[in-house]
Amino acid sequence: MSMFCFQCQETAKGTGCTIKGVCGKTADVANLQDLLLYVMKGIAINSLQARELGIVRQDVDKFVMEGLFATITNANFDNARFVALVREGLALRDSLKADIVKAGGVLPANLHDSATWTADSAEEFEQKAAQVGILATENEDVRSLRELLIYGLKGMAAYAEHAFALGYEDNSIFAFMMKGLAATTDDSLSADQLVALVLEAGKYGVDVMALLDKANTTSYGNPEITKVNIGVRNNPAILISGHDLRDLEDLLKQTEGTGVDVYTHGEMLPAHYYPAFKKYAHFVGNYGNAWWKQDKEFDSFNGAILLTTNCLVPPKDSYKDRLFTTSVVGYEGVKHIPAREAGKVKDFSAVIELAKTLPAPTEIETGEIVGGFAHNQVFAVADKVVEAVKSGAVKRFFVMAGCDGRMKSRDYYTEFAKALPQDTIILTAGCAKYKYNKLALGDIGGIPRVLDAGQCNDSYSLAVIALKLKEVFGLDDVNQLPISYNIAWYEQKAVIVLLALLYLGVKNIHLGPTLPGFLSPNVAKVLVENFGIAGITTVEDDVNLFMGA
């Protein structure tokens, strides 16, 4: 069986995975993801018509949000889960059509196939999936723009899901997801119209990150400067990875007083910066590094492991039986924690009971790392920052947000951080931080040279900080600030962050370690000519370029 996927930075040969995903997903899972997307496009077409009639169904919006999230890189590898999602999607789509008719609407005679096709067996799903994948769009520029839009929607959906878990939603974001998905079925749209939609996705990218920022800070307080322990204690423990702060809250409540410690991994590290989580004495610290090192770090952790969102790597047998997934995450043979019931906490008792029987983590490092520099914290020391710029103590800021990954070429970011002049400050968010957040880079007048705002969605904080600095310095354009953007990308959340920055007018962003394989030469040219998007070269040449040497 063949497949085609080029949504992540590590895609085979930089052009696409065709036999098995570099991420580990099989061809049948990749194809079922394509089919689920196809069904959701049909749902979106019907949803747009329903909305015109005043019909807004939260169950439909939630399904599309979670369905998009489930197809993100390293989220779900479970064939059976996707078969079930396709069936659920078809049923929802048809019930939505019934609502339209009941409300007096007339279904168009020429509905796109995605809004009418139906089947029930896994065999029929397999046959259809082979016909509706990425390569079904023959024009490479149209294909490139459609996929760029879809990947932006996937990132948007991930952030919307985190906000939704905390009780925050925005109907306009859901409506745009539907508009965007439906647009990818419309062969009448020109390249210019698709480019406009991609940029509109950036607008909603800003909105969804602002919504999630509000959800997180209202629920847990504003992140504050925090020292995070990276050593271990001698108690049984649970390692929580992913991004879902509501899951962390539920887990901390349920483990309190049990003798089980809780550690974060990967993108969950910034949870330590939120005031609400500091009251838990058993919330010990952060264990390990970025997602791609989990094959070794999950092994040495010894305890139970909970994956709340991506990034999951196909697990080794040595820890598979102590791994749990929840939410959109899934892997065949790995225990899954069901969704929380309305008004209740998610039941993590199975994770906790297993953890009690397991040995304490093996120590892999000691010390502390510092973070918590989201917009509110930076504004609290804004006078200090502004004075440092005016005095010349700080010559330039470098936004190095984004993702980490397996490729050896990503060592560039470690060396780049080391090579930056001492009068520069790195602003970061996302797991890209692990390339340099444990280096001794010092400080400038008490301001650490690495300011970590948080998770990848906290790139929003970096944008807010830039806009505030523009205002403070009385500039007309954010690009007049002494800020350079050298961003590492890996998956689709980085795509929506990029589109959000473009919407905010940020230009001359450098993207690496490679440019996306889903950008056709012509689409890449549009981004280069209109926004100054560029790749990376060597550390020395890039530092000189950014510093104007």
From Swiss-Prot:
Gene3D superfamilies according to UniProt: 1.20.1270.20, 3.40.50.2030
Record's cofactor remark: Binds 1 [4Fe-4S] cluster. Binds 1 hybrid [4Fe-2O-2S] cluster.
A GO MF term: metal ion binding
Binding site for [4Fe-4S] cluster: C5, C8, C17, C23
Pfam family, one: Prismane
Keywords: 4Fe-4S, Cytoplasm, Iron, Iron-sulfur, Metal-binding, Oxidoreductase
Catalytic activity: A + NH4(+) + H2O = hydroxylamine + AH2 + H(+)
Gene Ontology cellular-component terms listed: cytoplasm
EC number per UniProt: 1.7.99.1
Main location: cytoplasm
Binding of hybrid [4Fe-2O-2S] cluster, residues: H243, E267, C311, C403, C431, C456, E491, K493
Subcellular location: Cytoplasm
GO biological process, one term: response to hydrogen peroxide
Entry coiled-coil feature ranges: none
Cysteine persulfide modifications at: C403
Reported cofactor(s): [4Fe-4S] cluster; hybrid [4Fe-2O-2S] cluster
InterPro entries: HCP/CODH (IPR004137), Hydroxylam_reduct (IPR010048), Prismane-like_a/b-sand (IPR016099), Prismane-like_sf (IPR011254), Prismane_a-bundle (IPR016100)
Enzyme class: oxidoreductase
Keyword Cytoplasm included in the entry's annotation: yes
Family to which the UniProt record says this protein belongs: Belongs to the HCP family.
HAMAP family: Hydroxylam_reduct (MF_00069)
Function text: Catalyzes the reduction of hydroxylamine to form NH(3) and H(2)O.
Name of this protein: Hydroxylamine reductase
